[in-house]
Amino acid sequence: MRALLSVTDKTKIEKLAKDLCDLGVELISTGGTYQTIKEADLDVIEIEKLTNFPEILEGRVKTLSPYVHGGILYKRDNNSHLATVKELNIKPIDIVVVNLYDFQKALDGGNPEEIIENIDIGCLLYTSDAADEL
């Protein structure tokens, strides 16, 4: 089993990551979340290792990849999906742990550039993908 962790608010993320590791879950993570988990001396895979593509545009693009979204979205009971992910070597992502940027805080600040920077497309996509699999 694998989990993707990408959080803005890292409160207690080390504990959650440790608990997941103790359950035998393989952790995948992005940027600052990856660093926090790594500093807690836990095994974690950096998202770039999964996507085979570096984080670009100051972190704006880091996980938009079939290796991420395909791993979340494929239907585990669909033979066509199973054949596709096997052929493309896409591994399942079974758990998604995210929290969104504080958009309301940015909106209240009124700075248009800050507002745009706080539109969290990546975590919204993870949330949508994971919800599709419920």
Descriptions of predicted regions:
Residues M1-L27, T33-I45:
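N-terminal glycine-/serine-/threonine-rich phosphate-binding loop
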Residues L4-S6, I72-Y74, I115-I116:
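Short, flexible loop segments at the rims of nucleotide/cofactor-binding pockets, characterized by
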Residues K12, G122-L125:
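Well-ordered alpha-helical segments embedded in enzymatic catalytic cores
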Residues I28-S29, I121:
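Short beta-strand scaffold positions
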Residues G32-F103, L124:
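Glycine-rich nucleotide/cofactor/substrate-binding loop typically near the N-terminus or early
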Residues F103-E117:
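Glycine/threonine-rich flexible loop motifs
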Residues N118-I119, S128:
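Internal gly/pro-rich beta-alpha loop/helix module
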Residues Y126-L134:
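Single conserved hydrophobic/aromatic residue that forms the stacking wall/gate
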